[in-house]
From Swiss-Prot:
GO terms for biological process: cell redox homeostasis; removal of superoxide radicals. Belongs to the class-II pyridine nucleotide-disulfide oxidoreductase family. NCBIfam families: TRX_reduct (TIGR01292). This is Thioredoxin reductase.
């Protein structure tokens, strides 16, 4: 059984920033960056260019930013483990963390596990149907696949993520359709203007994909218009979901207070959770801002809160 003063679960901007601050405070943190549960480095690993992170006037690729943060955390003594924490016991002291058959203990814990992309429950989108055979939730991860080249592609969603995915896919697809169930977008004006100016992007308003069909790969979709109540079949090679995220909190087993959507509840103005010694940072506790810079800031808060807790 391995013991650490501080364990950080998660490896996005929140987790790495917490590790930087904690290691500089000589807390020798152990950071579990994940393995099977999701890509190490969090959602920014699937983002192309990040243009709004301070200090990079020309922008920076998401994975490069995460690599830099990881290197900085390790420079100050953070131990990074490519393992998943699958269960926790916060009812005992020290806390007990499970990773497969391994057991770890810690005096304080920062949860920075982020959130995962949601998927539509429609015919053809299941794991045993066309998931990863033309249906995905990450254009950056999968968009360059040969199956999408010079084909009609469809992005479901109306926020910034949906438009970013659509613009990325114009590099590969013949046409990219943004399918939105309303007649206005939630995305920022800057993103809307960019997408509307792209001659390869088209918008299907008041529309919903109700079925995905194909053989070994996606070949077509059925689109329902919720205004005129008609259904149209269109050729398609790819369907990309960009409809929001689900916080990665299931492994906590209800031991930390969550809101109705599964996000960790933290005390106002702090990273403290309902369990003393357990702190939360990043998108796992933030459903409003969801930015790399705010995640990093909350990671700093969590490290400082953990340091004060351990001192007392």
């Amino acid at each position: 059984m391995t013991h650490a003063k501080l364990v950080i679960i998660g490896s996005g901007p929140a987790g790495y920033t917490a590790a930087i601050y904690a290691s500089r405070a000589l807390l020798t943190p152990v950071l579990f960056e994940g393995f099977f549960s999701g890509i190490a480095g969090g959602q920014l690993m699937t983002t192309t260019e990040v243009e709004n992170f301070p200090g990079f006037p020309e922008g920076v690729l998401g994975h490069q930013l995460m690599d830099l943060m990881k290197t900085q955390a390790q420079r100050f003594g953070t131990q990074v483990l490519s393992k998943d924490i699958t269960a926790v016991d916060f009812s005992v002291r020290p806390f007990v963390l499970k990773s497969g058959k391994e057991t770890f203990t810690c005096d304080a814990c920062i949860i920075a596990t982020g959130a995962s992309a949601k998927r539509l429950s429609i015919p053809g989108a299941g794991d045993n149907e066309f998931w990863q055979k033309g249906v995905t939730a990450c254009a950056v991860c999968d968009g360059a696949s040969p199956i999408f080249r010079d084909k009609d592609l469809f992005v479901v969603g109306g926020g910034d993520s949906a438009l970013e995915e659509a613009m990325f896919l114009t590099r590969y697809g013949k046409r990219v359709f943004v399918v939105h169930r309303r007649d206005t977008l939630r995305a920022s004006k800057v993103m809307v203007n960019k997408a509307q100016a792209n001659e390869k992007i088209f918008f299907l308003w008041n529309s919903e994909i109700v079925k995905i069909s194909g053989d070994t790969l996606v070949r077509s979709i059925d689109i329902y218009n919720n205004v005129d109540e008609t259904t149209t079949t269109m050729e398609a090679a790819g369907v990309f979901f960009a409809i929001g995220h689900q916080p990665n909190t299931a492994f906590l087993g209800g031991q930390v207070a969550l809101d109705e959507n599964g996000y960790i509840i933290t005390e106002k103005g702090s990273s403290r959770t309902s369990v003393p010694g357990v702190f939360a940072a990043g998108d796992v506790q933030d459903k409003y801002y969801r930015q790399a810079i705010t995640s990093a800031g909350s990671g700093c808060m969590a490290a400082l809160d953990a340091e004060r807790f351990l001192e007392n």
